[in-house]
Amino acid sequence: MRKFLAGMMCFVLLLASAACSSNTETKNPNLSDVIGEIRAAIEFPEMAEIKVADLPMYGYDLKPEDVAEMQFITAGSGFTADEVVLIKLNDKSKAEEVKKMAEIRRDGIAETAQNYTPDEMEKLTTAVVGVKDSYVYYAATNDNAKAKEILTNAF
């Protein structure tokens, strides 16, 4: 009987310690690697790289000191909706606000595309927008499902 009780106590302690353990892993991906993986997996037209100082021109009300790291590529021609934005913020409390900026940008592009390039609308209606800790990401590509898979694994 004592062995049974001792075994049960060990089992209960094991369950309690498993319940208290944290399964949330904090990832710290290199954004250059993430954008490289996306570019390797998905076909893009000619893309232009955007610098942090130019973010306000693209609807992101951020100062360079707000951004710890960034990768931003957009269609060089402006005729397609292809765009990938990866931002690591210095202050993660701003992440939801920056996500909203990405959604507003997507909606603005969609409004224009609806009239001029309606075939680009699917990229925008299925675009990936998300936040994970201090990271914000937005992707409108030819394969948003693949972009989402890569981004989910990265963050």
Where are these regions (language model features)?
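Short, compositionally biased low-complexity segments enriched in polar/charged residues
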Residues: 49-79, 93, 97
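Bacterial signal peptide processing site
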Residues: 21-24
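A short acidic-to-branched-hydrophobic micro-motif
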Residues: 81-91
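Short amphipathic alpha-helices in soluble, non-transmembrane regions
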Residues: 98-105, 150-155
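An anionic, turn-rich surface loop/hairpin at beta-sheet edges
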Residues: 104-127
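C-terminal motif of bacterial Sec signal peptides marking the signal peptidase cleavage site
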Residues: 15-19
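A short, solvent-exposed beta-edge/loop patch
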Residues: 119-155
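Positively charged n-region of N-terminal signal peptides that target proteins for export
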Residues: 1-4, 8
